[in-house]
C-alpha cells in the first residue's frame, strides 16, 4: 500500500490494492465532459466527443493511452503523499567551480521562494552536480524530489550517477523499469509524471528541450500536476526552447546561465565536411582508430545505422562495433560496454544525442544534413566531445551533402 502514496492511478493499475484502499483515498472522474469535449483528468488533453466515443457510451483519452486507458465512466485514485523522515543523504564530496556554485545558490534561492527557474548551461557544464545541494536540502527536510527527463537512456544515466552520490534507494521509472517503491527521490521519464499527483516538493525537468517533452502540452500538464501546490520547479537545458524563452522575457520564469564547461576549457567546434563519399568517411574512421580513443557515430535512421554498422564490421574486423537504437533490446548493455571500453565503436541514432557521457570520445555524424538532425540535436551531439578533463578536446565531424 505504501507504493500508492502521491500516485494517480487507474483501477487497473491498482490491481489487488483496490480492495484495501484506505478511507482517505481521493477519487476523480477519469474525464470531465462538456457539451463538445472530453477532458482527461490525468493528462489534461481535451478531445472532441465524437472522436473519442466508445461503443459503451463512454469516452477515452487517446493522448495518454500508452500508460493505460483513461475512461469517462471510470475513476482515477489518489492517496496524498506521505512525509518522509529527514535524513542527510549526500555522499558526493566534490567541489563546484565558482560559476557552478553561483548556479547552485540560485537553485537554493528558488527553493526558498517556491519559484520556477531555468538553468541554461552549455553541454558539459556539470548540470547534474549543480542540483545536488538543492536535492539534498529537500530530502534533509523530509520532502520529496522528482527528477524527470524525456529520454529513457538519460533517466538510466541519472539513476546510476545519483545512486552513487546519494545514500538512499532511488526509484527509477520508465516503460521497462521495475515497479515504483516509496522513496524521497524518484528519477523517471517525463511520461511517468502522469502517474503522480501533488507528490514532489521539488521537481527537476532535465533536457527540457528534448522530444517528447518539448512543446507537449500533456507532459507540461503532468509536470504541474505531479508537484505540490507550493513547490519549486527547475528546468535544465543546454538548448532552450521558444516557449521557455518567452516565459523568461515576460518575467514569468527566472533564468540563470552558465557558458563554460566545468573544466574551464572551451566547447569543441564541429568540423563540417561537405562530402558523401564513403571512401572519405572510412578513411577518416581508420585515421581516428589509430588514436585509440572511442568513436561514437550518429546515423539519422535505424535502417541506415544498422547497415552502416554491418559495413564497418566487415571493413574493420579488429574493432568491437555495436549499434543501438530505440528498438534495441540490449541498448543499456551495449551503452555500458562502450563506456567500459569493451566496444571501440558505437553507432547510434539520436537516442544518445544528450544526457550521456563517454570519456575521451570522438563523434562522427553521418548525413548531418538529414531533417532529423535539428540545430538543437547537433549542438547536443557535439557536446558529447571534450567533456572529460583528461581529454577536453576531440574530434567532431559533420558529414553533409549541404546545409539544411
Where are these regions (language model features)?
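Hydrophobic positions on the alpha1 helix immediately C-terminal to the Walker A/P-loop
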Residues: 130-134
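Interdomain "pre-motor" coupling segment immediately N-terminal to P-loop NTPase/helicase cores
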Residues: 33-83
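N-terminal pre-P-loop "Q-motif" helix
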Residues: 92-115
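Conserved helicase motor
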Residues: 149-157, 161, 170-181, 188-195, ...
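Conserved strand-helix element at the start of the C-terminal RecA-like helicase core
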Residues: 119-128, 138, 143-158, 285-313
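Post-DEXD/H (motif II) to motif III coupling segment of the RecA-like Helicase ATP-binding lobe
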Residues: 198-272
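Conserved segment of the helicase C-terminal RecA-like domain
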Residues: 228-243, 382-404
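Conserved RecA-like helicase motor core of SF1/SF2 enzymes
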Residues: 207-210, 335, 339-392, 400-403
